[in-house]
Amino acid sequence: MSLRHMSRRASRFGVVAVASIGLAAAAQSVAFAAPAFSVSPASGLSDGQSVSVSVSGAAAGETYYIAQCAPVGGQDACNPATATSFTTDASGAASFSFVVRKSYTGSTPEGTPVGSVDCATAACNLGAGNSGLDLGHVALTFG
């Protein structure tokens, strides 16, 4: 899932898009470590389970988007019901819970309905980023 698609997906799902594309971060002369994005647990999941999401090394005070998606028919099919945004703290970190779904009705980043997504058979993932930075993707497997 590209950064452009992540921002577009978030705005399609009613999440306020950020105005900045990371120019302030690019203007800083301090070198930053590559961001880390993790989800725990990411396997043996059940429908409606809360997972812990952790981000570090991102830009401070920046808004990012997170969504559960799967490739369906050559396009991203994301869950608009759970897609949301989060903001990193002064050190570029964030920790929060996210509810994952074993199945959902997916939509493309443009908002076009794709149909049913079953994460028991599809390669579902949790992805995060904004138009300036892709934080990463973590594969989700359901038991």
From Swiss-Prot:
Residues 1-33 form the signal peptide. Disulfide bonds join 69-78, 119-124. It comes from the Bacteria. One of its GO terms (biological process) is defense response to bacterium. The keyword DNA-binding applies. SUPFAM superfamilies: Actinoxanthin-like. Keywords: Antibiotic, Antimicrobial, Disulfide bond, DNA-binding, Signal. It holds the Pfam family Neocarzinostat. InterPro entries: Neocarzinostatin-like, Neocarzinostatin_fam. One of its GO terms (molecular function) is DNA binding. NCBIfam families: chromo_anti. Belongs to the neocarzinostatin family. Binds non-covalently to a chromophore which is the cytotoxic and mutagenic component of the antibiotic. The chromophore binds to DNA as a weak intercalator and causes single- and double-strand breaks. This is Antitumor antibiotic C-1027 apoprotein. The gene is cagA.
